[in-house]
Regions:
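Conserved alpha/beta-domain cores
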Residues: 2-174
Length: 174
């Protein structure tokens, strides 16, 4: 797994391609173009076309792409774009819950950054961390808290999320 520190990552919705160039010029360590949460369902195809056109017009650009979650009808098309476009340097896989999901994403021949953001993903963390194609692990604390029914203002909830964060950190060093 890559051990370099990513201090700053900017998420940019693919529905706003004019913001991609601005983000790339910001000095952020990583620019993640979002095809998932920041994009309404009825705009998914257009968002992917926007990103494809941006990368065609800017062959020097290097971005990560947060694809749609496993089992989402748009994920296969997202992975195809990532495979075809040399400007995509890694795939950010939301809602990762199994090594098989990671390996499916890695089949596009790009490194994968799975996001652990559910109780199932946390339980499957040892297998996910050993899956082929992983470059680094990431953590979705808000979604994990929602999945587990935790109150965002609870001290106990913060302790649980800290334990999850610690587990992800340990597995990222293996």
């Amino acid at each position: 797994m890559d051990q370099t520190i990513v201090r700053s990552a900017l998420f940019v919705p693919a529905t706003r391609p004019e913001r991609i160039a601005k983000a790339l010029g910001s000095g952020a360590d990583a620019v993640i173009v979002d095809l998932e949460d920041a994009v309404a369902e009825n705009l998914k195809v257009q968002a992917r076309a926007n990103l494809d056109a941006f990368l065609d017009a800017n062959p020097q650009a290097r971005v990560l792409v947060r694809i749609n979650a496993p089992h989402h009808e748009q994920q296969a098309a997202d992975l195809d774009l990532c495979r075809r476009q040399p400007g995509v340097v890694a795939v950010v896989l939301p809602k990762a819950e199994s090594a098989a999901q990671v390996e499916l994403a890695a089949a596009c021949a790009k490194p994968v950054w799975p996001i652990i953001e559910s109780a199932r993903g946390l339980l499957e963390l040892p297998a996910i961390a050993r899956a082929a194609g992983i470059e680094r692990l990431t953590f979705g604390a808000l979604d994990l808290g929602l999945d587990m029914g935790l109150s965002s203002t609870s001290v106990a909830a913060q302790r649980i999320l800290d334990q999850a964060r610690y587990a992800i950190l340990l597995h990222s060093r293996l």
